Amino acid sequence: MLVLMHRGDSVRMTGFITAAVTGAFLLQTITPMAYALVEPVEEVPEQPTYVSHVVKMTAYNAVPGQTDSTPDRTSIGAYTNPDIIAARSKDLADELPYGTVIEIVPMATTTPLDVNCGRQYIHDMIGLRVIGDAMNPRITNTIDILLDHKELVTVNGKKRNPAKALGMCKNVEIRVVGKIDTKKMPKTQTELKLALEQSI
């Protein structure tokens, strides 16, 4: 339908529209709005999952008779640092390639005492370890912790080489916690932890 408007009607219509729009705006600004209160959600960092292996554990010293002809160097040419180095048997090469950082999972208090295992004597010497050496090919499913033969421990009132005090421990759980560049081998436990953080 066609509606004819006179000039005066046009002015009145414009005024009406302006009033309607203004009224709607005022109504919107004075009408209380309902806002849903949302509690902030705290993001929990995802815990890393670690690969574990159950192995035998022994210890060695960087001295002739326990290593090859270069006791001051590991099989990959790294300095034989008793603070961070561990060796592994050849059959574990795929699971624990050089540069893998492992931790020894503490024994449960309910674990029966193994008379051939002296973990309790050297526990504070282990820390984190970098796989940086290899063992005799005949040995299987074993990690070998490099320890300082001069840092003696007390066993039954007698001072002993820590590698001998450890003996052989069976069913030891180790956990892979990272990997580092063996060409930038840390020198201390503190440096190793820092290198591990930077590699993540």
Model-identified regions with their sequence ranges:
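Solvent-exposed, well-ordered loop and adjacent helix/strand elements within mature globular domains
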Residues: 6-9, 16, 27-200
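Juxtamembrane low-complexity tails/linkers enriched in Ser/Thr-Pro and polybasic
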Residues: 1-5
